[in-house]
Amino acid sequence: MKFIDESLIRIEAGDGGNGCVSFRREKFIPKGGPDGGDGGDGGDVYLQADENLNTLIDYRFNKRFAAERGENGRSSDCTGRRGKDIILPVPVGTRAIDNDTKETLGDLTQHGQKMLVAKGGYHGLGNTRFKSSVNRAPRQKTMGTPGEKRDLLLELMLLADVGMLGFPNAGKSTFIRAVSAAKPKVADYPFTTLVPSLGVVKVDDSHSFVVADIPGLIEGAADGAGLGIRFLKHLERCRVLIHLVDIAPIDGSNPADNVAIIESELFQYSEKLSEKPRWLVFNKIDTMSDEEAEERVREITEQLGWEEDYYLISAATGKNVPPLCRDIMDFIIANPREAETQQVAPEEVKFKWEDYHQEQLAEYQFDDDEDWDDDWTEEDDDEDWDDDWTEEDDEGIEFIYKP
C-alpha cells in the first residue's frame, strides 16, 4: 500500500434546524396557544485514531466530508431530529491542522482517541419559546445557525522511540534490518529508502523499542534538495536520535563535514528537534582494522569538538550492535515519553452560539413590551390566546432550552 503522510480535506459540520411557528388547533380548543417546536442541532465531525491504519491513502481522492443537517422543528412542540455525526478514522499519530489559520487542533496518539474538529450548528427556537404574559400568540422564531466548515490538513507522524539520522548510504536501513524483523530495501546507491519505515527491536523477553528509519538528508535539504526535510516530522515524537555516520564514505567526503551538515539541516527544520538527545554512531568499521577505525573516529570527534560518548559499530556484520541496543533500551526506560497533553481539570465549554438564543429572546421581549399598548386593537381579542396560561407564566419568558 502506498505510504501517504499528508492529506488536505474539506469538512463541513451540519447546519442547525430552524424553529417552527405553529399554533395548537383542536376541537373545542380554539385558542390553544403556540406549539412550534425547536429545530435539531447539526451533526459534528470527529477524527478517531485507529491502530489498524498506517497511511492516509483513504483521503487521497475522497476530499469532502459533510455531517447531516438538523431537522426543522414541527408543530405539537415536536423538536427536530439532531443531525448524524460523522467519524473519520485516521492512523495513530495523526495531527490535525486548520489549513487557513495554521492552528493545530490536536494530535491523536492513542488507539480509539477521538477529537472534535467541526462543531455542528445550534438549533433554532420555535415560537413556544417566546410565549409570555404579554405575548400570548408569538409569531417569532429563530433560524438554525450554520455548522463549522474548514479545510483540514492531516499530517501523519510515526510514533517511534528512536529515530535514525544520516546521509544517504550511511547504513540506516542495514542497521534496522540487523536489529529488527523489518526488511527495508538496501542497495549501493543513494536514496534507496524513499518512505519512512518502522522496526521493533526486541532487547530481551520483556523489553523492546520502536525505531524509525527515514530517507537520508543531504546539504540543502531545508531548501528542497534530495527528498527535502518533509520526513523529519516523523522524528518529532522520538525520545532519542541515532545519528549514523559512515566513517569511510565512498565519495571521499569528510565525515565531520557530513555530521555538521545534518546538524545544520536539523536546526533549520526545528530548533526543538535539534535539541533532542542525539547519539553519534560510527558505522562500517568492518571496512578497516580496529586501530584504524578508532584513529579515524578520534580525528572526526576532534574536528567536531564532540565531547560526549559515541559508538563504533558494523551494521552489516552486527559488531557492537547488541551493546548499543541495550544502552538505547536503558535510556528509554530512564526517560519515559512525555505526555502529549497536560491533564487539566475540565472546564465548562461556552459555544459561540450560546448567547445567540438569549439575545434573540431578549430582543423580541423588548419589542413586544414597547409595542403592546400602541398596536393593540379590539380585533386582537380574536388572536390565539393561550387558554392554559397560569400565574407561573407571569414571571416572563419560559426558557426551557439549556445548551
Swiss-Prot record:
The keyword Cell inner membrane does not apply. Its EC number is 3.6.5.-. GTP binds at residues 166-173, 191-195, 213-216, 283-286, 314-316. Residues 1-159 form the Obg domain. Mg(2+) binds at residues 173, 193. Residues 160-333 form the OBG-type G domain. PROSITE patterns: G_OBG, GTP1_OBG, OBG. Residues 363-403 are annotated as: Disordered. Residues 365-397 have a biased composition (Acidic residues). GO terms for molecular function: GTP binding; GTPase activity; magnesium ion binding. GO terms for biological process: ribosome biogenesis. It is found in: Cytoplasm. InterPro entries: G_OBG, GTP-bd, GTP-bd_Obg/CgtA, GTP1-OBG_CS, GTP1_OBG_dom, GTP1_OBG_dom_sf, OBG_GTPase, P-loop_NTPase. Signal peptide: none annotated. Its cofactor is Mg(2+). One of its GO terms (cellular component) is cytoplasm. Its main location: cytoplasm. Pfam families: GTP1_OBG, MMR_HSR1. Keywords: Cytoplasm, GTP-binding, Hydrolase, Magnesium, Metal-binding, Nucleotide-binding. HAMAP family: GTPase_Obg (MF_01454). Monomer. PANTHER family: DEVELOPMENTALLY REGULATED GTP-BINDING PROTEIN-RELATED, MITOCHONDRIAL RIBOSOME-ASSOCIATED GTPASE 2. Belongs to the TRAFAC class OBG-HflX-like GTPase superfamily. OBG GTPase family. An essential GTPase which binds GTP, GDP and possibly (p)ppGpp with moderate affinity, with high nucleotide exchange rates and a fairly low GTP hydrolysis rate. Plays a role in control of the cell cycle, stress response, ribosome biogenesis and in those bacteria that undergo differentiation, in morphogenesis control. This is GTPase Obg. It comes from Haemophilus influenzae (strain PittEE).
